[in-house]
């Protein structure tokens, strides 16, 4: 497939490298000359939007704040299939409504950015959401699912709304919490004593601020709802601490419940099974948190997470 990758940072660069290694005809596009020079050692590059016309697929990996310009200017008149890698999905669907668009989001990344941080195996074994709406062209969706599974990703069907709600809770909120933890611990002695717990809990606070700004701009309502849920949980913990003298087991029970839920992650996959590539089968798979590992002509090899009994 002839694929244009627009934006050659960590995610776009990694996708371009992986696709090139898989034998696809990759064209990189980036407005930054230094980035183009670095990428040119691996695949052809251009800074001219006119050069994208001969490609079959455009993978938009530009920062969120630039998506509107990419849709209206860089891809003006583009007739190929378009997908993106943004961490929010409802807003890109609106911006690219005039294109043949299927939203996507690879659940992979690092706290470092730029083409220098890109690696072709970044997505291997990682989940890659592909948005499946009632009006999504199933042929386009399947073509993208086949493409991303071919570089080792596990494709999860989901609606944009379902994705954005989940992403707010397992990704965007974590950036907010990491920044808050850094701010709470900003004392000389605390910083000297900080070790594993602080490092693990604050790792993503080292990410570029622009990354989080895109999450806020594109998913603010869901992020506020998730922040409210977190505040409620912290309020519960605070009440348990206040009641510790009279009810010392309450905070332990709160921790035990969280520990049990954490022990169930990541979910254990069931045996792989073939499913038809129909809208109904894919939607049902995504609704239970399942994913595709191999896409064939009319069927796909899929897995579902094991649901543990609560009895």
Regions found by a protein language model. Give the residues of each.
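Rossmann-like NAD(P)-binding element
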Residues: 49-76, 81
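Glycine-rich, N-terminal phosphate-binding loop of Rossmann-like dinucleotide-binding domains
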Residues: 61-63, 85-86, 132
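Rossmann-like NAD(P)(H) cofactor-binding subdomain of soluble oxidoreductases
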Residues: 69-116
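Internal alpha-helical scaffold of NAD(P)-dependent oxidoreductase catalytic cores
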Residues: 122-206
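Interdomain hinge/lid region at the active-site interface
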Residues: 194-266
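NAD(P)-dependent dehydrogenase/reductase Rossmann-like domain
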Residues: 234, 241-243, 247-311
């Amino acid at each position: 497939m002839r694929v244009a990758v627009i934006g050659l940072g960590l995610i776009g660069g990694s996708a371009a490298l992986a696709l090139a290694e898989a034998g696809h005809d990759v064209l990189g596009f980036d407005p930054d000359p230094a980035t183009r020079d670095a990428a040119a050692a691996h695949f052809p590059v251009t800074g001219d939007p006119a050069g994208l016309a001969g490609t079959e697929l455009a993978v938009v990996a530009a920062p969120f704040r630039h998506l509107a310009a990419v849709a209206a200017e860089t891809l003006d008149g583009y007739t190929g299939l378009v997908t993106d890698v943004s961490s929010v999905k409802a807003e890109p669907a609106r911006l690219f409504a005039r294109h043949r668009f299927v939203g996507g989001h690879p659940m992979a990344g690092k706290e470092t950015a730029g083409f220098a941080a890109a690696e072709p195996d970044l997505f291997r074994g990682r989940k890659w959401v592909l948005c499946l709406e009632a009006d999504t062209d199933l042929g386009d969706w399947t073509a993208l699912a086949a493409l991303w599974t071919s570089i080792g990703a596990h494709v999860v069907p989901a609606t944009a709304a379902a994705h954005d709600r989940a992403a707010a809770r397992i990704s965007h909120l974590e950036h907010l919490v990491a920044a808050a933890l850094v701010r709470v611990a900003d004392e000389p002695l605390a910083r000297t004593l900080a070790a594993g717990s602080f490092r693990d809990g604050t790792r993503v606070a080292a990410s570029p601020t622009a990354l989080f700004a895109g999450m806020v701009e594109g998913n603010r309502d869901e992020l506020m709802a998730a922040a409210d849920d977190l505040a409620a949980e912290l309020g519960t913990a605070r009440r348990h601490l206040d009641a510790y003298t009279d009810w010392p087991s309450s905070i332990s029970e709160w921790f035990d419940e969280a520990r049990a839920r954490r022990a169930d992650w990541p979910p254990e996959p069931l045996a792989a099974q073939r499913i038809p590539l129909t809208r109904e089968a894919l939607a049902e798979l995504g609704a239970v948190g399942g994913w595709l590992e191999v896409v064939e002509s009319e069927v796909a090899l899929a897995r579902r997470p094991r649901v543990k009994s609560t009895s």
